[in-house]
């Protein structure tokens, strides 16, 4: 029998997801479809009778607004919410703002997959002449970060390295106290948590596609190990289509 239950939600489609652009630390908002995805995710949790005690999210509005939509749908908007840059999306460096299909056409699908999905190879860093450099690096929400903490690009390994300490130091104690935890975050920061929970290899995590807006449920034992595979709250067809859409993002448009 499960000792704890954890729910993860990847943010709904953002305006830049819709345009197929590398987003990373750029603060794109949800698209109208993304708002609906988040709302449907919340309704799935409501219909299943889920209640929570504390929520965690990033400092990026697409994750925060996803959480708002979920909390609204389950009528638990009063819950405490902890926001942290450590749950931000991976920083895509110089690729930020570029169309993924155009980048694949220019550099080849294999190179784009390496940048997007390799475990420890970061994309080229964002230089000071990048159109979004100041927008991101000078944003006051990051004013307290040290120079070492503020990235100019990240691999998945880098993303996990800054997300996991927060998981271990802030989220795990809440779960072990019996708090029912909801995390609304991003594809790569959530993949870091999933990799840690399931003990997945670097190769396996590269191939994992988390769908947007669909609640992911983990039943955990007292050592926070999953007692069964992750479950998705949603009908099978919705889940399958969502995961296929995520996998197709870095391919050349036919």
Curated annotation (Swiss-Prot):
The modification Phosphotyrosine is found at residue 26. The keyword Transcription does not apply. Substrate binds at residues 10-17, 23-24, 62, 89-92, 100, 116-117, 187-188. The record marks 186 as: Transition state stabilizer. The modification N-acetylalanine is found at residue 2. InterPro entries: His_Pase_superF_clade-1 (IPR013078), His_PPase_superfam (IPR029033), PG/BPGM_mutase_AS (IPR001345), Phosphogly_mut1 (IPR005952). PROSITE patterns: PG_MUTASE (PS00175). CDD domains: HP_PGM_like (cd07067). GO terms for biological process: gluconeogenesis; glycolytic process. GO terms for cellular component: cytosol. Keywords: Acetylation, Glycolysis, Hydrolase, Isomerase, Phosphoprotein. The active site is at residues 11, 89. It catalyses: (2R)-2-phosphoglycerate = (2R)-3-phosphoglycerate; (2R)-3-phospho-glyceroyl phosphate = (2R)-2,3-bisphosphoglycerate + H(+). GO terms for molecular function: bisphosphoglycerate mutase activity; hydrolase activity; phosphoglycerate mutase activity. Its EC number is 5.4.2.11, 5.4.2.4. Belongs to the phosphoglycerate mutase family. BPG-dependent PGAM subfamily. This is Phosphoglycerate mutase 1.
């Amino acid at each position: 029998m499960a000792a704890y239950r954890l729910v993860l939600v990847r943010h709904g489609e953002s305006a830049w997801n819709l345009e197929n652009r590398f987003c990373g630390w750029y603060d794109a908002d949800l698209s109208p479809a993304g708002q609906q995805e988040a709302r449907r995710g919340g309704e799935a949790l409501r219909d299943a009778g889920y209640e929570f005690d504390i929520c965690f999210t990033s400092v990026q509005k697409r994750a925060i607004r996803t959480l708002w939509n979920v909390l609204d749908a389950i009528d638990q908007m009063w819950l405490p919410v902890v926001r942290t840059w450590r749950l931000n999306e991976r920083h895509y460096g110089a690729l930020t703002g570029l169309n993924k299909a155009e980048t694949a056409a220019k550099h080849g699908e294999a190179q784009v997959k390496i940048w997007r999905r390799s475990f420890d190879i970061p994309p080229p860093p964002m230089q000071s002449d990048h159109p979004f450099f100041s927008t991101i690096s000078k944003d006051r929400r990051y004013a307290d970060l040290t120079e070492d903490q503020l990235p100019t690009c990240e691999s998945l390994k880098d993303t996990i390295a800054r997300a996991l300490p927060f998981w271990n130091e802030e989220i795990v104690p809440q779960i072990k106290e019996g708090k029912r935890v909801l995390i609304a975050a991003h594809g790569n920061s959530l993949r870091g948590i999933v990799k840690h929970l399931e003990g997945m290899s670097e190769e396996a995590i590269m191939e994992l596609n988390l769908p947007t807006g669909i609640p992911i449920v983990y039943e955990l034992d007292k050592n926070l190990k999953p007692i069964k595979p992750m479950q998705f709250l949603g009908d099978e067809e919705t889940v399958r289509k969502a995961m296929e859409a995520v996998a197709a993002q870095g391919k050349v448009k036919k």
